[in-house]
Regions:
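Short, contiguous alpha-helical
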Residues: 27-65, 110-152, 158
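Carboxylate-rich helix-loop segments that flank metal/cofactor sites and access channels
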Residues: 92-110
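Structural signal for well-ordered, non-membrane alpha-helices
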Residues: 11, 15-19, 46-50, 84-91, ...
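Alpha-helical bundle segments that constitute or directly flank the non-heme di-iron/ferroxidase center
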Residues: 1-23, 39-57
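Amphipathic alpha-helix face/heptad-repeat signature
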Residues: 3-10, 37-38, 75, 79-82, ...
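Short, contiguous hydrophobic alpha-helices characteristic of membrane insertion segments
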Residues: 98-100, 154-162
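Helix-adjacent hinge/juxtasegments
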Residues: 59-98
């Protein structure tokens, strides 16, 4: 599936970057990220995919009910292992799902929207790339690591830049 390949490519890029960071850099608050850490952004990426995986069988996904597991944001080796697990969990058939969410902090009850597994994988892929752009900002602040030019950049933007360069 094209989506699985795209997610794999992004996860490989993210894992390779984590390998270059020290544990201290992974957990260092970044002023440019409002004192968030690279690890917190990685945790957020992983947990949204876990919510999708956990919601597959019952057919109901709620990203707001993620665990917010501090170990993911504080242990980069643990996080790297979870990236592999999450990718393996994407090897599933498409099926209809319900997405449950409160889009207003004052809402008393969530709304439910029709969606499907592949659509949610696509959402999570785009969400991951967005957070990788933020991670890029954080890494620039806490380290001297040279990131690939396409790190945190959507594939459509990469294609557009290539067309402009010709």
């Amino acid at each position: 599936m094209q989506l699985q390949t795209a997610v794999n490519n992004v996860f490989v890029q993210l894992s390779a970057t984590l390998d270059q960071l020290s544990q201290d850099q992974y957990t260092q608050p970044c002023k440019t990220l409002f004192n968030a850490t690279v690890g917190q952004h990685v945790r957020h990426i992983i947990e949204l995919f876990q919510c999708l995986e956990n919601g597959y069988e019952p057919g109901l996904v709620n990203y707001e009910k993620r665990l917010r597991d501090v170990r993911i944001e504080s242990d980069k080796q643990f996080a790297a292992g979870l990236l592999t697990e999450v990718h393996q969990g994407l090897n599933r058939e498409n099926k209809d799902l319900q997405l449950e969410a409160c889009y207003d902090e004052h809402a008393e009850a969530p709304i439910t929207l029709a969606t499907n597994f592949y659509r949610e994988v696509a959402y999570n892929l785009e969400h991951t790339i967005h957070h990788m752009a933020l991670i890029r900002v954080g890494i620039t602040e806490v380290s001297e690591i040279e990131l690939p030019e396409e790190f945190g950049v959507a594939s459509s933007t990469i294609k557009y830049r290539q067309q402009c360069a010709q």
